[in-house]
């Protein structure tokens, strides 16, 4: 699977002159996104793993620095980011271990922890001043479980509370993301 996805990305990148590629996945897709970053770190600008903690003892760290966001829901019983044992008996790597391992591997010099509220309660951890100026971010939603943030409750298995009336005007949007593009 990883090699096939890599080949598709390379063909697309060459044909359309794409510079920065971001990989994002949810649940098993988050595990796949993280595995892609570990196997081919030079192919991506950044990776985002949404509720896809790696299986206990199988978490990977790329050989080269890459920007990384790992998002988890504290009430997730499918792929738990904190308690590690899922409702079906599988064990997953704690989100904090992944964050700490990546931060250590890429020699990050600063670590900040911010608790904030944006419709839900969050704890955000950011490791900065790392090799190649990458950032490692851990974002724990303390009020949700195994959900894609903001999706309507009636859509698919991975649903959350309806947030269609969410007031996004309080957000500060810019043309640049945290990684400068």
Where are these regions (language model features)?
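Active-site-adjacent alpha-helix of alpha/beta-hydrolase-fold enzymes
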Residues: 74-136, 144-173
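Soluble non-cytosolic domains of exported or imported proteins
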Residues: 3, 27, 38, 89-93
